[in-house]
Amino acid sequence: MKSSIVAKLEALQERHEEVLAHLGDANVIADQDRFRALSREYAQLTDVTRCFKEWRSVQDDIEAAEMMLDDPEMREMAQDELKEAKARSEELEQQLQVLLLPKDPDDERDCFLEIRAGTGGDEAAIFAGDMFRMYSRYAEARRWKVEIMSASEGEHGGYKEVIAKVSGDGVFGQLKFESGGHRVQRVPETESQGRIHTSACTVAVMPAIPEAEMPEINAGDLRIDTFRSSGAGGQHVNTTDSAIRITHIPTGIVVECQDERSQHKNKAKAMSVLGARIRAAEMQKRQQAEASERRNLLGSGDRSDRNRTYNFPQGRVTDHRINLTLYRLDEVMEGKLDMLIQPIVQEYQADQLSALSEQD
């Protein structure tokens, strides 16, 4: 391993010990904000420190095995130990390189998940509903919380549009690669001839950001309309103008929220989604500029980004970004998404490593 990387790892190990000492300080414990920030830093440093300690231990094993090679009686055993230790050393070096990759500060945040029906009419709305159920199952398995912020239901089931907030550990980091176009090929329930139809929906995943980090939104740039909510809501439906539609005039971004019975709560929810959308649009512009010379696995949430095709007659799902095809569609639709998400994450990390090595 390069001496510059070893030096960086030694510095991180020292910082890990420093942070641990700070966490035992009574003054730090009394300051909850500082204590939380240091606790997060300690957790982030723990994996890389543990891996580095094991790597160092393996280097000692390699050295000991090499010394035993001079002893004829021990040579055969030493050769086996040396082979095993060198293989483990390579594994740990790869792990350390990944652990040293620049972290996206948004990865640990909650996120807003938006699913919109695209081409395909009623079938597209039904598919959007299936997608929302798939993500909800995935979230449930990871003990994340899913809260619907706004929903416009399809006439024959599913959703024309649904926006949900997903809360939990590392939510955005896991779901961010879902942004883009998703296509379904199947025979719709309404199809009497048994013909396969192609429908689509778009998914957008944005980090949920605290109020303090919200982009500055000028009240004069907003048009706020109220209207009567439709759909679920019991006796309050169509009796009060509690639903809110906010239009951000400079960008044309429109957010509707009608899930709550209180207009004030709907407005607060809509503003949080609007802030996240504006920030996501700004971040996307920056990412496009940075990634203009290399492929970008992070979709924009635009229908032109073709992420996956879900082919029901063949029980097949294909991720077009990395040419991955799995014949496990039933499991995927039940929320077992790690088999699709992890290969994308690994490919993204490989691209990052490649970019770093080019800089070196």
UniProtKB/Swiss-Prot annotation:
Pfam families in UniProt: PCRF, RF-1
The keyword Cytoplasm is annotated on this UniProt entry: yes
UniProt biased composition (Basic and acidic residues): 283-308
Primary location group: cytoplasm
CC terms in the record's Gene Ontology section: cytoplasm
Phosphoprotein recorded as keyword: no
Region annotation Disordered: where it falls in the sequence: 283-313
Entry GO MF terms: translation release factor activity, codon specific
PTM comment text: Methylated by PrmC. Methylation increases the termination efficiency of RF1.
Location in the cell: Cytoplasm
Keywords, in A-Z order: Cytoplasm, Methylation, Protein biosynthesis
Described purpose of this protein according to its UniProt entry: Peptide chain release factor 1 directs the termination of translation in response to the peptide chain termination codons UAG and UAA.
UniProt family annotation: Belongs to the prokaryotic/mitochondrial release factor family.
Protein name per UniProt: Peptide chain release factor 1
Organism classification: Bacteria, Pseudomonadati, Pseudomonadota, Gammaproteobacteria, Enterobacterales
